[in-house]
Amino acid sequence: MTGEKIRSLRRDHKPSKEEGDLLEPGDEEAAAALGGTFTRSRIGKGGKACHKIFSNHHHRLQLKAAPASSNPPGAPALPLHNSSVTANSQSPALLAGTNPVAVVADGGSCPAHYPVHECVFKGDVRRLSSLIRTHNIGQKDNHGNTPLHLAVMLGNKECAHLLLAHNAPVKVKNAQGWSPLAEAISYGDRQMITALLRKLKQQSRESVEEKRPRLLKALKELGDFYLELHWDFQSWVPLLSRILPSDACKIYKQGINIRLDTTLIDFTDMKCQRGDLSFIFNGDAAPSESFVVLDNEQKVYQRIHHEESEMETEEEVDILMSSDIYSATLSTKSISFTRAQTGWLFREDKTERVGNFLADFYLVNGLVLESRKRREHLSEEDILRNKAIMESLSKGGNIMEQNFEPIRRQSLTPPPQNTITWEEYISAENGKAPHLGRELVCKESKKTFKATIAMSQEFPLGIELLLNVLEVVAPFKHFNKLREFVQMKLPPGFPVKLDIPVFPTITATVTFQEFRYDEFDGSIFTIPDDYKEDPSRFPDL
């Protein structure tokens, strides 16, 4: 088939209507930069603020296929904090019989029965301890809540700790886009927030270990190559674009080893940090030794660890309790792709070279970013302080200039006792569940996301293979956004140039400049002899 015929077949390509929402709400414990919330950096050596380079459960928009059932979705592929896991280790056969059965009478629908949810709602710990052995504790009710959601929102600590002891999923979101951790932050019990945060990170580590064999097998089957791509960040916030960075990344892949060279260290506080950084993944090493970051300017290296100290966890809890709770959903229900046009008098489909590859350009239509921000747990002082810091950052300031010291937050006074009955809750119309917990203070906004994507049939790497590579380098937050975005059903070809949302106010244009199959000296995947280990070079790894 000729190139012209191929291009004609791609016009007005539309994805299947069955896709639904491909983007789940971003981690609500994150604070989206300039999107109305703020994530403070931890304090490192000498009392200076340090930056979250790899913590993906901050500033995150999560993109994945909508679940086909009410059960929580499967775990996304993320090497650090933001991977979710399945509800528990029970067998599929056991869970198959636990779906609720709706009872219909008089031509109307009666509420489905959720026994685990009911005993959590009523605080029946004894019955819960019995049901927990035979039921799916990660199941969602008709409002999208899991039993853990209800336990946290109602302040039923015993039920919550029992569910966590049986590995109830912490990352799963309800119909409003909130996870149990978000609801715990709203409720304000410090002990519960800490327990959920620790369980979230434990489940993330377990998810990484579970995916490792499949990932190594995929890398081994993929040829050795060199890939170069360019990042250019933009924002519609006045004065912000001038301080946003760009970056040229080089990826080397050999066997089950990957090296990524980058000049962009971080920009989560809106102050671009430049450097000469190399990220090395050694698939032959033990999991605890697999990930290494080299600072090529200072000639030091640090291994990425997953365990956090007690102090680090406590500081993170302080940050969560003093920041807005944020959730963002990129709705793709109405998404479509139409061919971009060029020319003034005689319009024709736009086809241009991107790097070395001929590509067809498409307009991405129907992409809507829906964001929610909650602050019922914050004092007026918290809100004013956060606003002042955000205003400074939007003008090019830096967190370190704020002399920020995290304040040890105490538990909040619990909200008034719940007066809603189980029957009232479960029989409420879907999407209109009576609110449980602290009275909401929530602001919602919607923004249409306009994007362009260039697809090439000439690019030698397939999207599935790219996803395996991006899964390895996902500790870099912006690479994780790219991995999530390309999981959408795209027009034919490989996305050699595309616009992706990174934060609610920031987009990135990613361009694949060069690709070639190649062989490399194995030494580039090892730590140079003259480099010294510095475990505190990147305090947030």
Swiss-Prot record:
Record-level GO BP terms: cellular response to prostaglandin D stimulus; protein retention in ER lumen; protein targeting to membrane; regulation of anoikis
Chain positions with Phosphoserine modification: S411
Ranges for region Disordered: 1-27
Ranges of compositional bias, category Basic and acidic residues: 1-20
Top-rank taxon: Eukaryota
SUPFAM superfamilies documented for this protein: Ankyrin repeat
Pfam family, one: ANKRD13_C
ANK repeats: 111-142, 143-172, 176-205
PROSITE patterns given in the database record: ANK_REP_REGION (PS50297), ANK_REPEAT (PS50088)
One Gene Ontology cellular component annotation held by this UniProt entry: endoplasmic reticulum
Gene Ontology molecular-function annotations: protein carrier chaperone; signaling receptor binding
Subcellular location: Endoplasmic reticulum membrane
Keywords: ANK repeat, Chaperone, Endoplasmic reticulum, Membrane, Phosphoprotein, Repeat
Main location: endoplasmic reticulum
Function of the protein: Acts as a molecular chaperone for G protein-coupled receptors, regulating their biogenesis and exit from the ER.
Full protein name: Ankyrin repeat domain-containing protein 13C
Organism in which the protein naturally occurs: Homo sapiens (Human)
Native organism taxonomy: Eukaryota, Metazoa, Chordata, Craniata, Vertebrata
